[in-house]
Amino acid sequence: MVAEDAPVRATCRVLFRTTTLIFLCTLLALSISILYESLITQKQIMSQAGSTGSNSGLGSITDLLNNILSVANQIIYNSAVALPLQLDTLESTLLTAIKSLQTSDKLEQNCSWSAALINDNRYINGINQFYFSIAEGRNLTLGPLLNMPSFIPTATTPEGCTRIPSFSLTKTHWCYTHNVILNGCQDHVSSNQFVSMGIIEPTSAGFPFFRTLKTLYLSDGVNRKSCSISTVPGGCMMYCFVSTQPERDDYFSAAPPEQRIIIMYYNDTIVERIINPPGVLDVWATLNPGTGSGVYYLGWVLFPIYGGVIKGTSLWNNQANKYFIPQMVAALCSQNQATQVQNAKSSYYSSWFGNRMIQSGILACPLRQDLTNECLVLPFSNDQVLMGAEGRLYMYGDSVYYYQRSNSWWPMTMLYKVTITFTNGQPSAISAQNVPTQQVPRPGTGDCSATNRCPGFCLTGVYADAWLLTNPSSTSTFGSEATFTGSYLNTATQRINPTMYIANNTQIISSQQFGSSGQEAAYGHTTCFRDTGSVMVYCIYIIELSSSLLGQFQIVPFIRQVTLS
């Protein structure tokens, strides 16, 4: 797919939705007109024939309205449910056919063929879904680690450092990026950015292999930081900010650092834009990508964000006195209710970060090349999420979910279902619904360790996202039982003991630690997918591991099967 295809597809979607809305509005207007004429006629009949004919007249009107409503409901169902499902099925069929043609071609001896940017047929229909029922989720175990070549390069000197991975996977392909620091792990001085894209293919042993088809090394003197990546049709989109000062200094600034969007297509087209989203200047002191991956949703690319909001601004005032306390806290915290509320309210404000309000949200950008003022910043309401932090967005079918790093006082994995409201064809508001869980804890310092259960001010933790294996919406009460997998650091206060796990709301079901006790580690990213040929579910756990040989950290992808026992 070439770069120009994306705007055409977006335009077609807009035309279809606009036509549908116009048709529905026309139908509504006709219905009102018919109803009005019917009422006038009925009034005339009643004045001439008395009340004897009223019942039959009302009955005919009721039948007429029922017929109109039935037609309207069928149109709404077809446009909102049936047609998208048919399009999704058609897309999968076309992708499978294209991949089949590409892999079956026998090439002439002197010809070359560039592999199509499409995953193997076995995986196309097994990506970005919930893979198990609620009952099956209770009986899952981790399979052994599988040996595959790493698609992630490491540092090549003892002084080098690779950090902050971001990975995105869709039906067609995957995108990956990380920061490369030449000396030490402080990314605010000078760093480069590694980017790659590729596909999933099966090995002769039957398990998947991540094949790299394109790489890009951004080494141009621009210090891009905390980049989030998302797959888009035909390539990758990456969101970074540019800064050459420590994180704390960013929060004390009067204006946010430079924001950049980079679009890299498989046909070697590269577009980079400095963006200026409306409502950011004079409101946000700093605005940062969430480092976790974004998603492509209804023609828009969504990225997780967080940053510091300036006191007295409209956003600050709108969030005043808002707070969120996860459902599980009531049974686990010994503080009285008033103390919990007071501490929860104050947890969003940091004197260490210049008394800014630490806020989470979503950056939404349309998929087109002229993005200077097109991207939008959508903040979460703080009565639905905790203090702002790094994060990740997921697509499960047609639903968007959000992971928020547990920087604040609640140490458990924070996952939310996100609802996005569109106005005039563009996203205008977001809301979040938390998946209640008292697992899996992250390490933290002081009173904010993995054992803490009560509200208070914290600025700690580590990024450790998780993949939902079951659908939280499948239960009568949202999220009352959910199973997920990921990696965490199995200690109360230190970044050590990386452990891969499967857990539900209340307990860890299966786990396996990597390396010896005391192995240092940091960020962890998890993504799962299904081989529809063997019906096996695989998960890739991307973990930052400390190294005594090459660099302070190496980023390692581990792959293993999740099995139903």
Swiss-Prot record:
Disulfide bonds join C161-C185, C175-C236, C227-C240, C333-C454, C365-C375, C448-C458, C528-C539. It is a single-pass type II membrane protein. Its EC number is 3.2.1.18. It holds the Pfam family HN. Keywords: Disulfide bond, Glycoprotein, Hemagglutinin, Host cell membrane, Host membrane, Host-virus interaction, Hydrolase, Membrane, Signal-anchor, Transmembrane, Transmembrane helix, Viral attachment to host cell, Viral envelope protein, Virion, Virus entry into host cell. GO terms for biological process: symbiont entry into host cell; viral budding from plasma membrane; virion attachment to host cell. It is an enzyme of class 3 (hydrolase). GO terms for cellular component: host cell plasma membrane; membrane; viral envelope; virion membrane. Residues 41-565 are virion surface. One of its GO terms (molecular function) is identical protein binding. The chain crosses the membrane at residues 20-40. It is found in: Virion membrane; Host cell membrane. Residues 223-228 are annotated as: Involved in neuraminidase activity. Its main location: virion. Glycans are attached at N139, N267, N504. Residues 1-19 are intravirion. The keyword Secreted does not apply. It catalyses: Hydrolysis of alpha-(2->3)-, alpha-(2->6)-, alpha-(2->8)- glycosidic linkages of terminal sialic acid residues in oligosaccharides, glycoproteins, glycolipids, colominic acid and synthetic substrates. The keyword Disulfide bond applies. Attaches the virus to sialic acid-containing cell receptors and thereby initiating infection. Binding of HN protein to the receptor induces a conformational change that allows the F protein to trigger virion/cell membranes fusion. Homotetramer; composed of disulfide-linked homodimers. Interacts with F protein trimer. The C-terminus (head domain) is involved in binding the cellular receptor. Belongs to the paramyxoviruses hemagglutinin-neuraminidase family. This is Hemagglutinin-neuraminidase. It comes from Parainfluenza virus 5 (strain W3) (PIV5).
